[in-house]
C-alpha cells in the first residue's frame, strides 16, 4: 500500500466540519431518523467521535468510536453503544470506516462485523451532486461492502455503497438487499446524486 491516510488529510473526507448531520428516510421517503456525528477529541492519530441517534424526535442511542489511521485506512477500534432502553453494549470488531484507493487501482480488503464477513472495495469515481441546491461535478471515493449469506437454504446478498468527497465528507449511503436498493443515510443538505463517467466529468469541468 502506497497511500497514507494521515498524509492525505483523511479528516477532509471523514468529518470536514467537526460535526455532520445525516437524515434517514423510511420506505416512503419521509424522514425516519437523524444521526449527528461530532469530534470529542482530535489528538494525533487517536480520534474520539460521538454519534447520537435520534428517532421520532427522541435520542435513542449514543455511540462512541475511537479511530486511528493505518496505511490507507481509518480504523474504528471500539464501539461503545449506549442504548436508552437496554444499556451499553461494547463491540470489539475492528472496522474500516474509510479508506483511500491505491493511486491507480481500487483498494480491497475483508472485514468481519459482528460475525458477518464483508468483501470491501474503495475506488475513485465521478459524480454529479446537488448540495444545498448547488449542482456540482466532483471526484468521489466510492466504498462498497458486500456480504453474501444463506438463510433456510436461500442465498441472500447485502451491498452497502457510500460516496465520500473531500471537504464534504460522506454524502450518502445506499443499501441493497437482494436487488432492492434504497438510500439509508444521506447528508441533510444533499438534494440528489448520480454517478457519471470520467468523460462526462471532464466535459462539464471545462
Labelled PLM ranges:
Residues 6-206:
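Conserved functional acidic sites
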Amino acid at each position: 500500500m502506497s497511500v497514507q491516510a494521515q498524509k492525505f488529510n483523511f479528516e477532509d473526507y471523514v468529518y470536514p466540519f467537526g460535526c455532520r448531520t445525516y437524515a434517514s428516510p423510511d420506505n416512503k421517503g419521509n424522514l425516519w431518523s437523524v444521526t449527528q456525528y461530532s469530534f470529542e477529541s482530535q489528538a494525533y492519530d487517536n480520534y474520539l467521535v460521538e454519534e447520537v441517534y435520534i428517532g421520532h424526535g427522541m435520542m435513542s442511542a449514543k455511540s462512541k468510536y475511537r479511530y486511528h489511521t493505518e496505511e490507507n485506512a481509518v480504523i474504528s477500534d471500539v464501539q461503545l453503544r449506549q442504548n436508552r432502553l437496554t444499556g451499553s453494549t461494547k463491540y470489539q470488531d475492528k472496522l474500516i470506516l474509510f479508506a483511500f484507493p491505491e493511486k491507480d487501482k481500487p483498494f480491497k480488503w475483508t472485514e468481519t462485523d459482528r460475525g458477518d464477513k464483508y468483501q470491501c472495495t474503495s475506488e475513485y469515481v465521478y459524480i454529479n451532486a446537488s448540495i444545498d441546491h448547488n449542482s456540482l461535478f466532483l471526484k468521489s471515493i466510492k466504498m462498497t461492502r458486500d456480504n453474501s449469506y444463506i438463510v433456510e437454504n436461500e442465498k441472500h446478498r447485502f451491498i452497502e455503497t457510500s460516496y465520500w468527497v473531500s471537504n464534504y465528507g460522506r454524502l450518502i449511503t445506499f443499501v441493497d438487499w437482494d436487488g432492492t436498493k434504497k438510500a439509508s443515510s444521506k447528508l441533510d443538505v444533499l438534494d440528489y446524486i448520480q454517478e457519471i463517467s470520467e468523460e462526462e466529468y471532464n466535459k462539464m469541468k471545462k
